[in-house]
Amino acid sequence: MMFEYALVLSSYLFSMGIYGLITSRNMVRALMCLELILNAVNMNLVTFSDLFDSRQLKGDIFSIFVIAIAAAEAAIGPAIVSSIHRNRKSTRINQSNLLKK
């Protein structure tokens, strides 16, 4: 019973993240949507790991690696966005032509 609830919640999180990535024009919002996608993937990893083999912790350990990648992205992403904002005076995705210079 809890398996279905976890899958529905993670699919909602994943679809909200994909929708936000497609429609957002702000880099900060895109980073937040990327975090939603990574959290949905973590929920799926833990849920399927618990469902198929609760004695082995392969899904749990892999989700810890995904959390570490998300933490690095959360630390580096805003620094890159603030650097782009300082140079371009905008955080809009469609206005940052970094390869043009």
Swiss-Prot record:
The keyword Isomerase does not apply. It is a multi-pass membrane protein. It catalyses: a plastoquinone + NADH + (n+1) H(+)(in) = a plastoquinol + NAD(+) + n H(+)(out); a plastoquinone + NADPH + (n+1) H(+)(in) = a plastoquinol + NADP(+) + n H(+)(out). Coiled coil: none annotated. It is found in: Plastid, Chloroplast thylakoid membrane. Its EC number is 7.1.1.-. One of its GO terms (molecular function) is quinone binding. Pfam families: Oxidored_q2 (PF00420). One of its GO terms (biological process) is ATP synthesis coupled electron transport. NDH is composed of at least 16 different subunits, 5 of which are encoded in the nucleus. HAMAP family: NDH1_NuoK (MF_01456). NDH shuttles electrons from NAD(P)H:plastoquinone, via FMN and iron-sulfur (Fe-S) centers, to quinones in the photosynthetic chain and possibly in a chloroplast respiratory chain. The immediate electron acceptor for the enzyme in this species is believed to be plastoquinone. Couples the redox reaction to proton translocation, and thus conserves the redox energy in a proton gradient. Belongs to the complex I subunit 4L family. This is NAD(P)H-quinone oxidoreductase subunit 4L, chloroplastic. It comes from Amborella trichopoda. The gene is ndhE.
